[in-house]
Curated annotation (Swiss-Prot):
Function per UniProt: May be involved in the conjugation of reduced glutathione to a wide number of exogenous and endogenous hydrophobic electrophiles and have a detoxification role against certain herbicides.
UniProt-listed GO biological process terms: toxin catabolic process
Protein's name in the database: Glutathione S-transferase F13
Family note: Belongs to the GST superfamily. Phi family.
Organism: Arabidopsis thaliana (Mouse-ear cress)
Catalytic activity annotation: RX + glutathione = an S-substituted glutathione + a halide anion + H(+)
Gene: GSTF13
Residues where glutathione binds: S11, A12, H40, K41, K53, V54, E66, S67
Amino acid sequence: MAMKLYGDEMSACVARVLLCLHEKNTEFELVPVNLFACHHKLPSFLSMNPFGKVPALQDDDLTLFESRAITAYIAEKHRDKGTDLTRHEDPKEAAIVKLWSEVEAHHFNPAISAVIHQLIVVPLQGESPNAAIVEENLENLGKILDVYEERLGKTKYLAGDTYTLADLHHVPYTYYFMKTIHAGLINDRPNVKAWWEDLCSRPAFLKVSPGLTVAPTTN
């Protein structure tokens, strides 16, 4: 039986899992969850994720939530299919993948997601973005990208010379970020820009990106 992924493909966190599924050439069923109708707050969904956020994944008797936990599971279960996203055959390489995945989760994502929330989500809720929050997180993001610029001057991808979860996890929020007037934070750093353009050229991304349809209503 194919895995069932519950969510809306416009969600960055759902897209993160979709990218992984496509990279691993894994059969799955996407079960739509209407976020605008708050279907992620219904009891049927809360039984899968008590925090009421997409995505959730069901694989036989296993239910998972949190996108990075889901991608780790998919990458491990299907380690011999598709792209090797974890470098599991070499403990040192695998450790570097985990290291840069932690950087994404604890440094990059908090900054970029805060910007996206203010510029895309808040206006959709009929409110005005908080300029101070945007500015503070753009400053933090710039410092993080300076570290990336140096790193990507040494390796093609964050965890080495092959594409892994450490790169994949960045893609959806960065895609939305590049739709804003602040895309220069990426484009003005040659190594980061080249890395991003490489990520955008992957077949899995080309399958997922049409679903990322939310656009900024303010800059």
